[in-house]
Design a protein with these regions (language model features):
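PLD/PLD-like phosphodiesterase catalytic module centered on the HKD motif
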Residues: 1-139
Length: 139
């Protein structure tokens, strides 16, 4: 998590438009709480975070000007080393237009999280998040 966080922050500092979408409705509450733990550092650095409101979202997209990677790969140890997950590299401009349209629609139906909102989350959740962080590499 720290390597990914650091990479996102460094990209933002280089002027990259970095936005993150996470599910508002989780499949596992403890995973949502662990994910939410990292919002603060990202938000403080100007990275915009959104929660997808219509339901659960599991897709992952990295979108650049001339290419994209689309898949369902979780950014964690288990997905990279224990599971056989994958994504596809897209560089076809026509298909990229479809990815961009889907991307824009996903942001349209997502709710942006502010730093103030994150900072003022319930104390009980904050305590639980600090506890769960210890186990984050195992989940």
């Amino acid at each position: 998590e720290e390597t990914l966080t650091r990479s996102l922050v460094e990209a933002k500092r280089r002027g990259v438009d970095v936005r993150v979408i996470t599910p508002n409705i989780p499949d596992k509450k403890h995973v949502k709480w662990m994910t939410e733990y990292y919002y603060g550092e990202l938000l403080k650095c100007g990275i915009r975070i959104y929660e997808y409101t219509p339901g659960f979202v599991h897709s992952k997209v990295v979108l650049e000007e001339h290419c994209a990677v689309v898949g369902t790969i979780n950014m964690d140890y288990r997905s990279f080393y224990l599971h056989y997950e994958n994504g596809i590299w897209i560089y076809n401009e026509e298909f990229l237009q479809e990815v961009r349209k889907d991307f824009d629609e996903t942001f349209r139906v997502s709710r942006e999280i502010t730093y103030e909102e994150w900072k003022n989350r319930p104390i009980k959740r904050q305590v639980m998040q600090h506890f769960l962080k210890v186990f984050s590499t195992l989940v």
